[in-house]
Amino acid sequence: MKEATARQIADMKMQTIGVEVEMYGITRRDAAGIAADFFGTGRFVDTAHRNGYYTWSAWDAKGREWKFQRDISIDAAGSAEQTELVTPILRYEDIELLQELLRRLRRAGAKSNPAHMCGVHIHIGKGDHTAKTLRNLANLMASHESLLIAAMRIDQSRLGRYCRTVNRTFLDRLNKEKPQTMEKLADIWYEGNSAREGREHHYNGSRYHCLYVQ
């Protein structure tokens, strides 16, 4: 293995991530209970008073909080089953833990598919990223988006609303100006997606893309 490749792999393993998985067929309370049992802590409580979104939380052996929140966009039998798992900050070594938790939830009846407006969100920590590396990421995403969409079977209705592809106006300006600072990159992102107003808001209009730069 080349030294540069080995270094890239080592850096990747240090990357922090947060994952959100939308599901139905299981209540938030039941999902939190299953998680608490899986973690071996048995600790799960209703934390809606603190977290909102009708949240139930479970804690793992490291004291990290795993949230099960309501997402009203999910097509479920009832509001109690509009369940979204929100992980704490994870690292490479936590991937197997997350995978096994999802298997446990699936065996308990949880389902996640595009027909029920379910999706997966992966948040990448800023870490050592620069405006240049994020520009590279945007171009990489744009060139492979169609393959990812096909592989994940993303519903057409989501593509038109929640999972829009990379905006060409944003991408063209990004590659023309090649921003050197995060501040300039942010300007290009929000302006390129016609979402400059209210850019500090959580539900800013630019968020509903397969790739979301925040």
Residue ranges and their predicted role:
Residues 1-114, 127-214:
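C-terminal accessory/tail domains of diverse enzymes
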